[in-house]
Design a protein with these regions (language model features):
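Pyridoxal 5′-phosphate
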Residues: 1-408
Length: 408
């Protein structure tokens, strides 16, 4: 069990009043708040160690480089990668997935297929649309059954034509957690490369990329109590060796001639220019913070909150919840609509009560088209949320329903 009240003291942003109400922050799927440990680590880096990495021999440069590479090792341990060669720092999940799709362009040919699902974030759709457009490959979608991934549909479409499978570990709308280990086995049976968008899973559960046996795994720092502008791409070494750099410039080179150049070894051949040093170090601080709490404890806490709030939400007349009703398949994300009330109006009404939620298509328009809704509201939970926050959400929804009664 988490001591949430102690945890909340580490997040000063939560201690504020919004519209004369205590802030209840339930937009964690969009971004999470940052603990003092992360803020202080970043501040200390800029105050004491700020210098460019891998370049200078002076003490500041050596300290900065040591901290930057120590951060890579922290991430390696956190996701259980086999080597730091397999851990690339990027700007975030979007960048990571774009890099993999660019690699796919080197492999795909006309008649090949890429398999994704209808629940994907745009960052795991558009790069594949582009890769298929450029190569003549076909983008194939797996659809849903009872609010979760239709595994029968996946098995039927997973043929030897499929060269890449790219799926969200957890949906940022439905909250469903996909059986990635099982899907990876199926993908490898037909020789496909398995790519996972881990943006919505890595902050909330223990990740072991070797146990999952995935070929690529992407996630972002800002969704797991870390800073913005930093993310990670894990890739199996054999694929990263084949993969061409996406960006070119300083630091990723071994030697430059007038008409050609050679690249550094992994992982540095992918990290051109001055990297986000403070971001990487801040992300490592976030990982340390989360691991002190315990990833199993974090997952259990969020499951407890969902089990508590879900039936209360179901009891609100006119409220529609999207996704599987099997709570064992769900993460701490709940998308919903209240009657015919537009989600933006609903989110605005909740904000008047101090409750911060997301409203819109959540960068998942194909999913919402499939669900036949233009948008939803979304509440998403994290380590600092409480059952009192759940009660406040339910109370605010009831007040909103009463205020708009008769209009939907």
């Amino acid at each position: 069990m988490l001591d949430v009240e102690v945890i909340r003291k580490d997040f000063p942003i939560l201690d504020q009043i919004v519209n004369d109400e205590p802030l209840v922050y339930l937009d964690n799927a969009a971004t999470t708040q940052k603990p003092l440990a992360v803020l202080e680590t970043i501040n200390r880096y800029y105050e004491q160690d700020n210098a460019n990495v891998h370049r200078g021999v002076h003490i500041l440069a050596e300290r900065a480089t040591a901290s930057y590479e120590a951060a890579r090792e922290t991430i390696r341990k956190f996701i259980h990668a086999g080597s730091t060669k397999e851990v690339l720092f990027t700007r975030g999940t979007t960048t990571s997935l774009n890099w993999v799709a660019r690699f796919a362009e080197e492999i795909l040919t006309e008649g090949d297929q890429v398999l994704i699902s209808v629940m994907e974030h745009h960052s795991n759709i558009i790069p594949w649309q582009e890769a298929c457009r450029k190569t003549g490959a076909e983008l194939v979608y797996v659809y849903l059954k009872d609010g979760a991934l239709d595994m029968d549909d996946l098995r039927a479409k997973l043929t030897d034509k499929v060269k890449f499978v790219s799926l969200a570990h957890a949906s940022n709308v439905l909250g469903v957690v996909n059986p990635i280990k099982e899907i990876t086995k199926l993908a490898h049976q037909v020789g496909a490369i398995m790519v996972v968008d881990g943006a919505q899973s890595t902050p909330h559960m223990k990740i072991d990329v070797q146990d999952l046996d995935v070929d690529f795994f992407a996630f972002s720092g800002h969704k797991m109590a870390g800073p913005t502008g930093i993310g990670v791409l894990y890739g199996k070494e054999k694929y990263l060796e084949q993969m061409s750099p996406v960006e070119f410039g300083g630091e990723m080179i071994d030697f430059v001639y007038e008409q050609s150049a050679s690249w550094k070894e992994l992982p540095w051949k992918f990290e051109a220019g001055t990297p986000n040093m403070a971001g990487a170090i801040g992300l490592a601080a976030a990982v340390d913070y989360l691991e002190k709490i315990g990833m199993d404890a974090i997952e259990a806490h969020e499951q407890e909150l969902i089990a508590y709030v879900y039936p209360k939400l179901q009891a609100i007349e006119g409220l529609t919840i999207y996704g599987s009703q099997d709570l064992a398949q769900r993460s701490g994300v709940i998308a919903f609509n209240l009657g015919d009330l537009h989600p933006h109006d609903l989110a605005t009404a909740l904000d008047y009560e101090g409750v911060a939620v997301r409203a819109g298509h959540h960068c998942a328009q194909p999913l919402l088209q499939y669900l036949e809704v233009p948008a939803t509201a979304r509440a998403s939970f994290y380590i600092y949320n409480t059952k009192a926050d759940c009660d406040k959400l339910v109370d605010a929804l009831q007040k909103t329903k009463e205020f708009f009664n008769g209009t939907f």
